[in-house]
């Protein structure tokens, strides 16, 4: 679990591809995601930065709701923690929607994105325009379905 905090969102990574592959390693298996920097560049940049910093290592999935989603990325495990900064939503020009198996930013309202994210079990169209979708599962749907509250992200590799 990370106790790192920053004052502002990270600078943009110059060599970030339009599609970035990320792997979340858990005791239940790996969740492999394609992250779409072409649609949500700030969000993907933030996720990559935090993953490379080890911010997510040892952090739990603190909220799990069956047939809805699994949520993690809060180093306190309470649902109120983050990296020390917030950044804006990315809806304009982003065609990604809350289908089954997407990764999206958890937030407390407009412009409050930080480190918390969720992965959907099923379509959640009521979240479109409220949370930035920035990727999709390419492997490990069964792992997402098996995750229980309190399960740990051992690490995220990008």
State what each model feature region is.
Residues 1-158:
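Cyclophilin-like peptidyl-prolyl cis-trans isomerases
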């Amino acid at each position: 679990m990370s106790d790192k905090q920053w004052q502002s969102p990270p600078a943009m990574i110059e060599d970030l591809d339009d599609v970035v592959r990320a792997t979340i390693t858990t005791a239940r298996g790996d969740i492999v995601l394609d992250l779409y920097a072409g649609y949500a560049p700030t969000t993907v940049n933030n996720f990559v930065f935090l993953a490379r910093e080890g911010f997510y290592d040892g952090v739990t999935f603190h909220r799990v709701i069956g047939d809805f989603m699994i949520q993690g990325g809060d180093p306190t495990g309470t649902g109120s923690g983050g990296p020390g900064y917030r950044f804006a939503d990315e809806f304009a020009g982003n065609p990604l929607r809350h289908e089954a198996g997407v990764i999206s930013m958890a937030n407390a309202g407009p412009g409050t994105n930080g480190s918390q994210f969720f992965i959907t079990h099923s379509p959640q169209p009521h979240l479109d325009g409220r949370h930035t979708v920035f990727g999709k599962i390419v492997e490990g749907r069964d792992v997402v379905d098996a995750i229980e509250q309190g399960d740990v992200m051992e690490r995220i590799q990008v």
